[in-house]
Each structure stands twice: as structure tokens, then as C-alpha cells.
Regions:
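Rossmann-like short-chain dehydrogenase/reductase
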Residues: 2-145
Length: 145
């Protein structure tokens, strides 16, 4: 489906009209194109503490299959699942690194108190998501906890 407004404001006259009227300029989002890597950028992966590692192992296999550049926080125990899947994960040093994807496995969260782990993962890196970046939280339905 075409976006007539988006196409219009991308033209030279459309830019002038939109600017003079104070209209918003839509952001061009990254889209998958055949032949390109599925993830074009770094992925920061985190995991809630807990005994069940099945979801983390699945996530690690998927990241291995798409050849993603993976980072982990130093305190995160998802490193073992990534290593078992053959993913070489780099340490997130907390510098100026930008991430295309923030991915958190929340499948071990079973009560509201454990939601603090989500906060601890995202609050330091939320402003370091690249344009057209993604924030993904993987979890279970309440019936399966």
C-alpha cells in the first residue's frame, strides 16, 4: 500500500509545504529486502534469571542462524546458551555502542517483583537503539508460567 502523504513530503515541494505548515515529516523505516542480512546491526540480548533455559536456547539458535552481531551484559547468564549455539557474544561495555535490536527473554518472570529485571536491562540502553531499531521481549502466557 502506498503512502501518499509520505511520498508527497519526500518531494522538494512537499518538504517546503510540510515545513511551512508545521506538518510532521515521517521517518523512513528500514525494511527487509531479499539478499540482505535479516539483522543489519548489533543485537543486545538479555535474560531473566531462572532455571528454564529452553526459550534462551531457541533465541540463541535463531541468532546463530541469522549471523547476528551479538552483545550481552557482563552479568547475564545467557552467555552459556549463546556459546552452545555457536554464537560469539561480545561484552556490552556500556560505552557509546548503538544497537539495532534489544532482545530480552522474560520467560522466567513469574511475578511482578521480577519485572525489575526488565527495567535493569532496558533503562541503561533504551537511548542507544538505532533508527528503525526494534525492542523485543519474549515471554510466556500466564497460563504457562
Amino acid at each position: 500500500m502506498s503512502d501518499r502523504y509520505g511520498d508527497f513530503v519526500q518531494s522538494s515541494i512537499g518538504k517546503k509545504v510540510a515545513k511551512n505548515l508545521g506538518l510532521p515529516m515521517p521517518t523512513t523505516l528500514d525494511r527487509f529486502e531479499s539478499g540482505e542480512r535479516l539483522v543489519r546491526g548489533s543485537v543486545l540480548v538479555g535474560r531473566a534469571t531462572g532455571d528454564d533455559k529452553s526459550v534462551s536456547e531457541s533465541v540463541a539458535r535463531i541468532l546463530s542462524d541469522v549471523h547476528a552481531e551479538v552483545y550481552v551484559n557482563s552479568s547475564d547468564d545467557i552467555k552459556d546458551a549463546l556459546a552452545d549455539a555457536g554464537v560469539e557474544a561480545k561484552a556490552n561495555t556500556g560505552g557509546d555502542d548503538q544497537f539495532k535490536v534489544l532482545l530480552f527473554d522474560a520467560s522466567n518472570i513469574s511475578n511482578a517483583e521480577q519485572l525489575k529485571e526488565l527495567y535493569e536491562f532496558f533503562h541503561t540502553v533504551a537511548r542507544r537503539v538505532e533508527k528503525s531499531g526494534r525492542v523485543v521481549v519474549v515471554g510466556r502466557t500466564p497460563e504457562n508460567i
